[in-house]
C-alpha cells in the first residue's frame, strides 16, 4: 500500500504504528470488515493499471453504506451466499488509458451492464482510481447513474466503491471487491 500509517485502520497496523502484513488478501477476509475499515483501506490502496485487470475477475459485494443494523447484516449474508446473482466483472482494456467492461451475472451466464474504464480522480479523496462509468445508451436508465471505482489492495485483489450519481452529488452506496 502506498499511504501513511494514519490511512490504515488500526486493526491492520502493527504495534509500532507501521503498516503490517495483515492487509486483507482475499475476498472472504474483506467481507468481515466494516465500512470505516473498508474506507481506510480504499484510501491507502494503489491505482491499478488497466492491463492488470484484463479478463474475468471474481466479485463480491462487501458492505452497504445506506443500510444499517439487521438490514445491512441481511444484505451482507445474502451477498456472501451462492444465491447472490453478481459473479464479477470482465475488463477489456483498449490501451493503457481506456477500456471497456461488463458485469457477469447468474453463474456467469449473463453479461449485463457495460461500462467504460479510465483513470481519474476518486470521489473518495485526493487520489486517483480506475473509474467504471455505466452511462451509455445500451444500459437501462436505472443503471446509467452508477459510477464505480476500484483501487488495488494487493496484486490480484481490488477494492471498489459504487456511487449513485444524482444531479447535485454522487452518493457512496456500497463497497465491493474483485479478485483474480
Region locations from a protein language model:
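Soluble ligand-binding/transfer domains with enclosed cavities or grooves
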Residues: 2-180
Amino acid at each position: 500500500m502506498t499511504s501513511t500509517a494514519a490511512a490504515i485502520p488500526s486493526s491492520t497496523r502493527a504495534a509500532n504504528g507501521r503498516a503490517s502484513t495483515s492487509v486483507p488478501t482475499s475476498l472472504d477476509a474483506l467481507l468481515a470488515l466494516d465500512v470505516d475499515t473498508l474506507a481506510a483501506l480504499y484510501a491507502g490502496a494503489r491505482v491499478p493499471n488497466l492491463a492488470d485487470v484484463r479478463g474475468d475477475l471474481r466479485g463480491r459485494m462487501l458492505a452497504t453504506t445506506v443500510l444499517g443494523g439487521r438490514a445491512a447484516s441481511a444484505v451482507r449474508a445474502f451477498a456472501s451466499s451462492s444465491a447472490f446473482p453478481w459473479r464479477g466483472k470482465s475488463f477489456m482494456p483498449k490501451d493503457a488509458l481506456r477500456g471497456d467492461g461488463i458485469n457477469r451475472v447468474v453463474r456467469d451466464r449473463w453479461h449485463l451492464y457495460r461500462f467504460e474504464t479510465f483513470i481519474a480522480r476518486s470521489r473518495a479523496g485526493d487520489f486517483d482510481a480506475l473509474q467504471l462509468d455505466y452511462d451509455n445508451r445500451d444500459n437501462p436508465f436505472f443503471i446509467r447513474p452508477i459510477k464505480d471505482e476500484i483501487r488495488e489492495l494487493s496484486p490480484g485483489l481490488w477494492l471498489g466503491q459504487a456511487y449513485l450519481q444524482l444531479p447535485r452529488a454522487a452518493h457512496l452506496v456500497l463497497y465491493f471487491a474483485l479478485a483474480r
